[in-house]
Amino acid sequence: MAIERQVTEAEEPVSPFARLFSLPGLDVFNIVTIGCKTEGNASTIVEGIKNTLINHPRFSSILVTGHGEHKGKARWIPTKINVEEHVIVPDIDPNIENPDEFLEDYTSNMALSPMDMSKPLWEFHLLKLKTSHAEAVTVARFHHSLGDGMSLMSLLLACTRKTCDPEAFPTFVAPKKNKAKNVCFSLVAWLWFIVRLMFHTCVEVIKSIVFICRASDTSAHIMGKPGATLSANKFIHRIISLDDVKMVKNAMNMTVNDVLFGMVQAGLSRYLNQRYDLETSSKSRKNLHNIGLHGVVFFNLRPNRNIEDLAKMMAKGSKCRWGNSIGYVLIPLGMKPQDDVFEYVRQAKTIMDGKKHSLEPLFSYGLLKVTMEVFGLRGLKTLVKRIFGSTTMIFSNVVGPDEEISFFGHRIAYIAASTFGVPQALNICIQSYVDKLIINIGVDVDVIPDPHHLCDLIIEALRMMNSAAPKKVFHASKV
């Protein structure tokens, strides 16, 4: 196959959300770090991308945001693409003293490096660097205008195959569905579902509107700087056992997501309380327990909520849409210290159940679309900055493959994803892969100068839950 490929498709308009994510001050990117169990081979990756990734029109087109006489007419323009220009192999000393720290610095510096808008907005950096968890590392960077995290992860996983079966796509754990015992039970359950849906939707939508109109997070210790998106970022990740989380999940009869959000909230609470203990008066420490902090959690709005491979997503008649198709919910964060670490998980479950049983994600998506249609791009930008600039963190949990996969012949050890260019000073993305969970934390170091300590506190919360979980199961069995 030739190195250069001529794309003949006609120009395509840019969606409102793609334009939003390319505006100055809202230039949002996704970074995916792939740890490999084998040494990286650039030529293999280049050849693989030629046969997969660039077949998607978004990845072989230039984004024109509108300028000069064509101002306002944003569009995708198909172009010739030289894949080698998008696969970067930096010269790295193989005997570098601290490879893990080098990887953190490298990915962090990518957040400050602008992308060349004259080329398709994606790139792969192949680091021939042996770290604690990988023999080599590939770091992919995608502009958010190409699609939301679900779309981009699907596209990336479409480039992979099962290690045990090189022709098979990755598989994912399917969510369990409750089966009704009889028609009457099914009817009652359906009616109860509708009642709960209407109630929770009204409550959560009203809360969301009140927050947009009046509220804002008040802790300078963890808030991003207003309007700032490109600042001194730091990206770190840790790998923990999925079984440890499932142990707590089973002990409390909750979901993995409940446990993850609970441990994040526990770690964040301890972190912020420690910061206040060191830097403020006792009166301020009391006020910390009452301040209103909020997180943003994204929901996939596609009918099929599992990550799909690109072949299924792009197939004719697929129920899964391509592009930015996500909603968000606003989650209150309790900073009051709890004597019982499980209380954080209980709070997380109560909050998340209300969100999951409401239409708030659809409302938030619809609000952004209506704002765009009525007030235009400037109004949409103002609303987005109002919402995301007044919240403390972004939290996301992505379900990954349940079996080991290979990326163009490179066996994958882990996958860590994150987003940068957002106003929040804290971005936590948790990605599952086989029997692992990868916690990826992105911070603004001017606001959170010690992200490793924050990550330690989050993982320590899980250890505390694990230590107490067997006793909790024993107590429950006796009761």
Swiss-Prot record:
GO molecular function: diacylglycerol O-acyltransferase activity; long-chain-alcohol O-fatty-acyltransferase activity
Subcellular location field: Cell membrane; Endoplasmic reticulum membrane
Membrane protein topology class: Single-pass membrane protein
Cytoplasmic compartment segments: 1-182
GO biological process: triglyceride biosynthetic process
Pfam families given in the database record: WS_DGAT_C (PF06974), WS_DGAT_cat (PF03007)
Catalytic activity: an acyl-CoA + a 1,2-diacyl-sn-glycerol = a triacyl-sn-glycerol + CoA; a long chain fatty alcohol + a fatty acyl-CoA = a wax ester + CoA
Membrane topology (Lumenal): 200-479
Description of what induces expression: Up-regulated in the stem epidermis during active wax synthesis.
Glycosylated residues, chain numbering: 253
Expressed in which tissues: Mostly expressed in flowers and siliques and barely in roots and stems.
Active-site residue numbers: 144 (proton acceptor)
Keywords: Acyltransferase, Cell membrane, Endoplasmic reticulum, Glycoprotein, Membrane, Transferase, Transmembrane, Transmembrane helix
Enzyme class: transferase
TM stretches of this protein: 183-199
InterPro entries in the record: O-acyltransferase_WSD1-like, O-acyltransferase_WSD1_C, O-acyltransferase_WSD1_N
Main location (coarse class): membrane
Pathway involvement of the protein, from the record: Glycerolipid metabolism; triacylglycerol biosynthesis; Lipid metabolism
Domain of life according to the entry: Eukaryota
EC number: 2.3.1.20, 2.3.1.75
GO cellular component term, pick one: endoplasmic reticulum membrane
PANTHER family reported for this sequence: O-ACYLTRANSFERASE (WSD1-LIKE) FAMILY PROTEIN, WAX ESTER SYNTHASE_DIACYLGLYCEROL ACYLTRANSFERASE 2
Primary role: Bifunctional wax ester synthase/diacylglycerol acyltransferase. Involved in cuticular wax biosynthesis.
Family: In the N-terminal section; belongs to the long-chain O-acyltransferase family.
Entry protein name: Wax ester synthase/diacylglycerol acyltransferase 2
Organism: Arabidopsis thaliana (Mouse-ear cress)
